[in-house]
């Protein structure tokens, strides 16, 4: 078997006449933490749903653990865990029962399920709330429980659709640390997120999709270097002199009206030149980020 | 995942088990309703109508009103229990709690989830009927051994009315829309299926309509099992009707739910 846990080939997803995923191809390697980024409605959830056989493909082919998902979905699902974008915890049950009863769907014996539930409750810091009903949990606890539940079958592949949306920074950082530990244990992880900082920190590799198509694929740092450079000059407000200077020098830039981004690649002298001559106070030199890449590639208009 | 043939296996029992474990937590409510309902009916209708309807003619037998009506309490409860479970409750699990979505990340097919849910609805009907039959037995209103036939009847009726509930779950956009089938289908059946008066009292055309409805057959069998007057003809016709309708509507419910859920 190849080293790829997921192989996506020319996959399409249509809802009626609307094409949500438009022929995308990518691989996720064993042990990798792979990111799926894109604006709202880009087709991330649609893609993820096809990966675990929730949603049938409209075209192309998709293999997970070497199985064709269309025919081998049962074997595939036995070895993966999913944390949905929308909460799908069982509100009628306690925290512990959510884990133990879910284990039943995988046919895990009860004693084993109890054992694993103990470990997962501890791993996610929920052991004191095990008897609480899901309704009593905070958003962060619910999300932790949802991820814990996705791990009850000790999956080789963990699929997380926006696992950190709506969480406070503390919980988010704690989750990153848990994900890093899972990755160290050899779990392959694919995740979607709207937090670019998160993607930059966590992902070994990522793709940015828009309108159902892949725009770029690569390592976060490489993408930053390739598309925006290590450093960016940001000026706000923008004076006319600066506008002229940038055009004359033919610098790659983005003029947002009240704000201007100048991609100076690795040329630090430009910054000194600008601050000496033009707006001293309104100009900063900062690191290029994945967010810059994202906005540059997907544009700044609102979606949906 | 496939759109055509149902994908069923014993895994559907895992869904059944989930429902059982969740329901077990509130067992007292589940236990009290079928315990008290027959007592309420018997005291209210039984004593209330005792003077108005001293006795009633049913298929050549002369019965007191309580003896006539008691089996219908079980039959209508079988209908309501499974229908409610696979309409309102299943809809809540599907739509609000996303329970089905969660289970669809495990090695279970949509067919198994829905079949497990219908099986659970039937199990609830069976449990309620068992409790009700026990209570009615204490009042001497169930004859044995034929009364034991109520148990398989409850399960079969539960499958059928659960499937009917699930058919509507496959269509409704919001939970309020279940009031429509209740008003147009369930309540008329409750009133006109030989439940509270013998069908012979109805004009011929209305009798024919009544015999087309599943509850009429469920009531007829339940009554004859309780009275000890059940005939093979009865079992063949009404049992055959219920079985055929179940074998038709359960696969139809699976198919329509697949269409709703698999997108
Ligand atoms: N079941 C469906 N029926 C019809 N259209 C759908 C369905 N599911 C998704 N879509 C549409 O497909 C497109 C992609 O949706 P998808 O949920 O995959 O986006 P996403 O990238 O996950 O977005 P978000 O970041 O908002 O979660 C959207 O335009 C959405 O409206
Ligand atoms: Mg999404």
Segments from the language model and where they lie:
Chain B
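Hydrophobic transmembrane alpha-helices and immediately adjacent juxtamembrane helices
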Residues: 1-144, 152-263
């Amino acid at each position: 078997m190849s080293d790829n846990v997921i192989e996506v080939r020319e996959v399409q997803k249509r809802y009626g006449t609307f094409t949500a995923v438009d022929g995308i191809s990518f691989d996720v390697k064993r042990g990798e933490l792979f990111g799926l980024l894109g604006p709202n409605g880009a087709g991330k959830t649609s893609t993820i749903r096809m990966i675990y056989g929730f949603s049938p493909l409209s075209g192309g082919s998709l293999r997970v653990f070497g199985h064709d998902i269309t025919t081998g979905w049962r074997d595939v699902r036995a070895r993966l865990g999913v944390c949905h974008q929308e909460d799908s915890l069982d509100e009628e049950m306690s925290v512990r029962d959510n884990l133990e009863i879910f284990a039943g769907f995988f046919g895990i014996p009860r004693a084993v399920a109890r054992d694993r539930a103990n470990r997962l409750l501890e791993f996610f810091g929920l052991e004191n709330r095990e008897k609480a009903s899901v309704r009593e949990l905070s958003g962060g606890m619910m999300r932790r429980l949802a991820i814990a539940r996705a791990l009850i079958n000790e999956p080789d592949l963990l699929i997380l659709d926006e696992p950190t949306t709506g969480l406070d920074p503390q919980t988010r950082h704690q989750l990153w640390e848990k994900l890093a530990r899972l990755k160290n244990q050899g779990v392959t992880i694919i995740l979607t997120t709207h937090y670019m900082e998160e993607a930059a920190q966590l992902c070994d590799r990522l793709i940015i999709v828009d309108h159902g198509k892949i725009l770029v694929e690569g390592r976060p740092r490489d993408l930053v270097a390739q598309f925006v450079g290590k450093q960016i000059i940001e000026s706000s407000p923008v004076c006319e002199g600066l506008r002229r200077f940038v055009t004359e020098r033919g610098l790659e830039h983005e003029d947002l009206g009240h704000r201007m981004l100048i991609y100076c690649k690795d040329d630090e002298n430009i910054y000194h030149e600008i601050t000496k001559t033009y707006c001293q106070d309104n100009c900063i030199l900062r690191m290029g980020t994945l967010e810059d890449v994202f906005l540059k590639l997907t544009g700044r208009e609102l979606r949906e | 995942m496939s759109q055509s043939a149902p994908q069923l296996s014993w895994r559907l029992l895992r869904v059944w088990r989930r429902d059982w474990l969740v329901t077990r937590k509130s067992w007292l409510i589940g236990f009290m309703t079928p315990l008290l309902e027959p007592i309420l009916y018997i005291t209210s209708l039984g004593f209330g109508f005792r003077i108005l309807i001293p006795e009633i003619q049913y298929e050549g037998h002369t019965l007191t009103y309580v003896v006539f009506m008691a089996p219908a309490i079980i039959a209508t409860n079988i209908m309501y229990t499974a229908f409610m479970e696979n309409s309102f409750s299943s809809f809540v699990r599907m739509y609000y709690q996303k329970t089905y979505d969660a289970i669809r990340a495990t090695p279970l097919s949509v067919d198994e989830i829905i079949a497990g849910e219908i099986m659970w609805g039937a199990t609830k009907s069976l449990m309620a009927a068992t409790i009700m039959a026990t209570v009615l037995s204490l009042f001497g209103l169930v004859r044995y051994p034929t009364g034991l036939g109520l148990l398989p009847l409850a399960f079969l009726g539960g499958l059928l009315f659960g499937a009917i509930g699930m058919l509507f779950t496959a269509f409704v956009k919001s939970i309020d829309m279940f009031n429509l089938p209740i008003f147009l289908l369930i309540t008329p059946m409750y009133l006109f299926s030989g439940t509270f008066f013998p069908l012979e009292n109805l004009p011929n055309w209305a009798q024919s309509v009544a015999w087309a409805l599943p509850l009429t057959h469920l009531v007829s069998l339940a009554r004859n099992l309780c009275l000890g007057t059940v005939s093979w003809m009865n079992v063949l016709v009404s049992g055959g009707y219920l079985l055929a309708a179940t074998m038709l509507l359960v696969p139809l419910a699976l198919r329509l739910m697949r269409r709703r859920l698999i997108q």
